[in-house]
A protein has these predicted regions:
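Short, flexible loop segments at the rims of nucleotide/cofactor-binding pockets, characterized by
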Residues: 14-18, 43, 84-85, 229
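Active-site phosphate-binding/coordination module
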Residues: 22-123
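Short active-site oxyanion
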Residues: 35-39, 61-63, 153, 213-214, ...
Length: 269
């Protein structure tokens, strides 16, 4: 019996227009009415989730959201932080050094801000900030490492070819010290070592006394893989890559074909 539904957002809950289909909203409410806990698990920061949570009609209910690819978990009744992993000042210095050696730009997140280091934000950073409903805050390395802000996650953004080059040159080295993932063609993400959506979900499941066998997780991208494998039932979206699909227990329709609603109807309702 499924007791917890873990949902990725971009490419899963959201369609390509970055909207939540009504079929998804209806199915999610039906699952919650059956007693299933909803946990959105996303690479987005908290401020990039809030408007969608309100659209779901669940604002201030006692559910949970895992953001920043597992770096922080919030309880939605008051949006308090219940679990987190953060980057140290030396981590940030290391990430900054990698960005300086490449053509990608480093960004950082705390609970309230989308920070950009290394000068004016490039076009890809600007576009990403719009997607998460955020203004950009330019910050120096000295400010970023001052300890005044709790920095959860670093992201390197550039064109697809620039991000390819960054990944080829630095991913092997970076992943010895961080959890790194190419979440999108233009984004490479770095979290504290051992931090994924799955590790955050595992800790939350312990708090809620829910076994992994009672969890259904849905996603489409590389940063969803650990979560799909951790859950008792891991479902890949129809728009996922063949690689992600090969690691899932089942495949549903795409995010343009109400794939989340179809899976909820099949496995929960």
């Amino acid at each position: 019996m499924i007791k917890l539904l873990a949902l990725d957002m971009d490419g899963t809950l959201l369609n390509e227009a970055k909207e939540i289909p009504q079929a998804h909203i209806t199915a999610i409410h039906q699952a919650i009415e059956k007693g299933v806990k909803l946990v959105l698990c996303t690479g987005r920061p908290r401020f990039g989730v809030l408007p969608y949570y309100k659209k779901l009609g669940l604002d201030l209910q006692n559910e949970y959201v895992i953001v920043n690819n597992g770096c922080s978990t919030h309880q939605t009744s008051d949006w308090s932080l219940v679990d987190w992993q953060e980057l140290s000042p030396s981590d940030i210095e290391y990430l900054y050094d990698l960005a300086e050696k490449s053509d990608v730009q480093l960004t950082l997140f705390d609970e309230e801000h989308y920070f950009v280091l290394g000068g004016k934000p490039n076009e890809i950073v600007q576009n990403d900030a719009k997607l998460v409903f955020s203004d950009l805050t330019e910050i120096s390395l000295e400010e970023a490492t001052s300890g005044k802000c709790r920095m959860f996650q670093g992201m390197f953004l550039g064109t697809e070819s620039q991000t390819d080059d960054f990944e080829q040159r630095f991913a092997g080295e970076l992943c010895q010290r961080f959890s790194g993932v190419r979440s999108q063609p233009v984004i490479y993400e770095a979290m504290p070592l051992g931090t994924t959506k799955a590790t955050a979900l595992s800790r939350l499941a312990e708090i809620l006394k829910i076994d992994s066998s009672e969890i259904m997780a849905m996603g489409d991208a590389n940063n969803d893989i650990e979560m799909l494998q951790f859950a008792g039932l891991g479902i890949a979206m129809g728009n996922a890559s063949d690689y992600v699909k090969s690691l899932a227990d089942a495949v549903t329709a795409s995010n343009e074909e109400d794939g989340v609603a179809r899976a909820i109807e099949k496995y929960i309702l």
